[in-house]
């Protein structure tokens, strides 16, 4: 068994000060697995389960089990251990793609603004009654504002294709499909693994939103949102996290306190880079919304 240890668990993405961002744990576990296989083998299928909250104040050990090693395939199982308890499990396998879905025809990132750029404009519109928002949306906006006020800088810039739909202002929509462009800040260079890990890190950022944002129309206020599992299939080995990519997120079903979401990621030239799925816990202390 190979063991890797980290104390770097704090990011701007975490929902609370003591709970680690799931995408970070996923990316670190992937890095640990890749460190135990031949350089010629690239990760394709990754299946993970979030078992317990990961405390950012405590170190995590990643235990990598070498399940199978062959000339063309290897399988690794990674267990994230904190205080003797398994908090996260990831299984990694390689594979290849033979066809792909076409990239959707959406607005280019060049014509869009990032979330931080629209906050001041949005506050002015609300103050002058040109935009009226529901309490659930007001709470959501304040969350973004707190991050800006505290000068918390994300690793990525995200530009939603429909900012009104993304935040829940303007003409309300019940669409459960959302499109966003994203890229990492700064230049990452040609390190294949670093780019891959950062792309994996970011896949956990927006998927849950496709489940609860459509319910803003009913003033739905989620009281708990957390990932139960996260699965990624990488169709391309070479990817640049510091170049613009289009992320499509869709929620196909929600009920009984859970929701299922899917994601597809294209690079700017239309190549499908990866597909992913996620099941989340989605709860509210307020109204029950149905759309």
Regions found by a protein language model. Name each.
Residues 1-291:
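Terminal targeting signals and extreme-terminal segments of soluble enzymes
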């Amino acid at each position: 068994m190979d063991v890797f240890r980290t104390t770097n668990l704090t990011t701007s993405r975490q929902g609370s000060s003591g709970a680690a961002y799931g995408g970070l744990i996923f990316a670190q576990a992937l890095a640990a697995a890749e460190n135990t296989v031949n350089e010629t083998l690239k990760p394709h299928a990754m299946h993970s389960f979030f078992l317990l909250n990961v405390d950012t104040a405590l170190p995590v050990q990643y235990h990598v089990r070498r399940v199978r090693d062959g000339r063309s395939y290897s399988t690794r199982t990674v267990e994230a251990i904190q205080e003797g308890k398994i908090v996260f499990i990831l299984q990694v396998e390689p594979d290849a793609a033979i066809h792909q879905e076409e990239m959707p025809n959406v607005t280019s990132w060049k014509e869009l603004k990032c979330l931080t750029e629209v906050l001041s404009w949005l506050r002015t519109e609300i103050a002058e009654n040109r935009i009226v928002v529901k309490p659930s949306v007001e709470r959501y906006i304040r969350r973004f504002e707190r991050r800006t006020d505290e000068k918390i800088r994300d690793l990525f810039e995200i530009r939603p294709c429909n900012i009104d739909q993304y935040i829940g202002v303007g003409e309300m929509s019940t669409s459960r499909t959302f499109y966003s462009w994203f890229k990492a800040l700064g230049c990452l260079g040609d390190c294949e693994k670093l780019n891959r890990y950062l792309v994996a890190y970011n896949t956990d950022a927006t998927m849950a939103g496709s489940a609860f944002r459509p319910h803003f129309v009913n003033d739905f206020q989620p009281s708990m949102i957390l990932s139960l599992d996260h699965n990624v299939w990488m169709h391309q080995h070479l990817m640049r996290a510091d170049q613009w990519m289009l992320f499509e997120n869709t929620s196909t079903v929600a009920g009984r306190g859970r929701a299922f979401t899917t994601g597809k990621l294209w690079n700017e030239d239309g190549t499908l880079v990866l597909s992913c799925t996620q099941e989340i816990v989605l709860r509210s202390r307020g109204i029950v919304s149905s759309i």
